[in-house]
Amino acid sequence: AALNRLGIQHPNLHVFSESEMLPAASQGAIGIEVCNTNMQPGILEILSNINCQETFKATRIEREIVAALEGSCLSPISALGTITNQTLYLQVRVSNQDGSNTIEKECVFSMADEESALKKFKDGLIKCGAKELIQS
């Protein structure tokens, strides 16, 4: 995006599609943290006005996947959640450390069924060996 804004084109530039390179969990989302002590009046109201609830929910779910697999920001885990009309489309890809073996899973569920559907999805990832794969 920055290269486009600056009008810079490079012959060796390739924009990856999500099918080629799924992003890490919460990649590209901006998080703002505030200190409870000494907070200026109105800060929470301002932040609530710029918070996108769908992005907030999707990134929380992406991070839940990483946590379920006992991963970290250094783990080879990609997760992308997209919420449209209260329906989540979740794509997850995990690999071993050198990327030679991968597991890819996706699911679609209503946000009304989030808790049970997400638990079933996380359990399925674990059952197919995703935890072990990221450690190998």
Per-segment meaning from a language model:
Residues 1-136:
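Small-molecule-sensing regulatory modules
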